[in-house]
Amino acid sequence: MKRETLKTLWLGSALVMFGLASILSPSIKIGEAIQSDKPAQSFKIEDLAWISGDWETAPGRMQIDEHWTKVAGGSLIGMSRTVAGGKTVFFEYLRIEARGADIYYVAHPKARTPGTDFKLTRLTTQEAVFENPAHDFPKRIIYRKNADGSLTARIEGDGTEKEKPQDFQYRPISKAN
């Protein structure tokens, strides 16, 4: 009988110690489990329809035009072209697509493959923020629909002098063009 009592006490002590160790141990990621219980924010690709259309910057030494299809098949397809001195000096194929519960902006500068993914992290009726903290530059791409009907695209890096934010002010391309 004494042996059974000692065995029960030992087993109970072991369970208590294991429980305390799991609470106190930094290798156990309790915060992750709690975090994973939070509902994931879900975005709908249709909520990005305001990006669709034909956009251009004001004429100057260089001009950029950007074109986005309407939302269809879980994606928007885009392209951007920069013209300076009468020549195309840069172009980029773009895609915004739903992948499961997430939405990604995929950039293919100069048709480079594979593209670079930027995950949608914030979406309102007038602004979309796409991020890829592991990318060199940009780390963040922001599209904003302005009250006057224009579109602002902003690229941001880590905030250093080398990676200053850049804003691109687009207006709708007139039908006469």
Question: Model-predicted segments: where are they?
Answer:
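Bacterial N-terminal signal peptides that target proteins for export
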Residues: K2-V16
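Edge beta-strand at a domain terminus
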Residues: D37, G115, K119-L120, T125, ...
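Well-ordered alpha/beta subsegment
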Residues: F130-N132, D136-K145, A153-E156
